[in-house]
Amino acid sequence: MDASSRAPLTEREALGLGRLPGADLLAGAVDGHVHACPHINSRSLDVFEAVRQAAHAGLSGLGLMDNFANSAGFAALARRQLGHLGVDVWGGLIMEPPAGGVSADMVRIALAYGYEGEGARFISLPTHHTRHIARLEGRSPAYVEACFEVPERGLPDPLPEIFDLIAASNVVFNTGHVSGDEAVRLVEAAKRAGITRILVPCSHYDENVVQAVTSLGAYAEFSFFFATHATQAGLTHVDTERHTVPPVAAPSMVQLIRAAVDERAVLSSDCGVFLLPPPVEGLREFLLLLETCGIQRAALRRMVADNPRALFRVRTT
C-alpha cells in the first residue's frame, strides 16, 4: 500500500494519544482552563481546533479563558458549530482591566453574552492585575498600588453587587490570583452572598489555605502550567514588560492537592502558549505526572472529570 492510498490519520492518531500512557484518563475529562486564539498573544491552536482535539481525545468539557476579553461568545459559537462532537464548551469573564475591570456592568454583559439562554459560566477576579501577582512579578510600587486587592475588612465596591449577580445566575465565582489570605476572605464573603460555585486557583498557596477554602465548600484548582518550564519565560501582557512567576515542583503540588478537604480539587491544563503542548496533551502529561508522584487514578478521575463536571454544570449529549 502506497502512501496515497492510506486512510488519513485521525486527529487522535496525529496527536499520538491512543498509544500514550495516561490517555485513558482523558475519557470523560473536563479541562476548564484553556487559552486559545483569537488572542492578543500567540497561541498554539484556535478555539475550533481546541474543541476538535478535545473531542478526539474523549473529553466531555472545555472551558475557554482569556485575560483580555469575555470568552463566552467564542464558546457559544463553538457549541453551535461543533456541538455535534459532544464536547460542552463554555466561557466567562476575567475582570482584568483590558476586559473592563472589576465592573458590575461588564459582569451583566458577560452573563447574557451568547445566543439566547446562554452566557458566561464563570466570573473571575483579576489573574494578573492584582497586588499579589504584581509583587511576585517584581512590579514597581506605583504599578502595585493600582492593582486589585481585598482589604482585611469588608469588600471593595462593586464586589458586593457582583456577588449578587453571580449568586442569582448560579455561575462559578473564580477568586483569581490573589493572596492566600485574600482568597479565604473572598470565599467566606461569597458564601455569605449565596454563591455556591466557587473555584480558587491554589497552585501557589500553602496547605493551610487549601484546607481552609475547601473546608468552606470551594474547589481548589491546580494547573499544569505552574509545574512546567513555561513559568521561566517572561509573560507579556498589555504592556512591554516581561515577568515570571515562581514554578511549583510536582511533589509540592501533590502535597497541596492532598490538603484539599474531601478531594475538592480540580485539575486543568492552563495550556495554549507555544512553550507548552496543546491543552489535550498538556492535560495528559499533567495527569501522568501526578500519578507518578503518588496520586491514585480514582482520585485523578474525580478531580479531572467528576468535580469540574459538577462545578461547571457540564452538559452531556
Predicted regions and their residues:
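An N-terminally biased module of ancient metal coordination in phosphate/nucleic-acid-related enzymes
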Residues: M1-V87
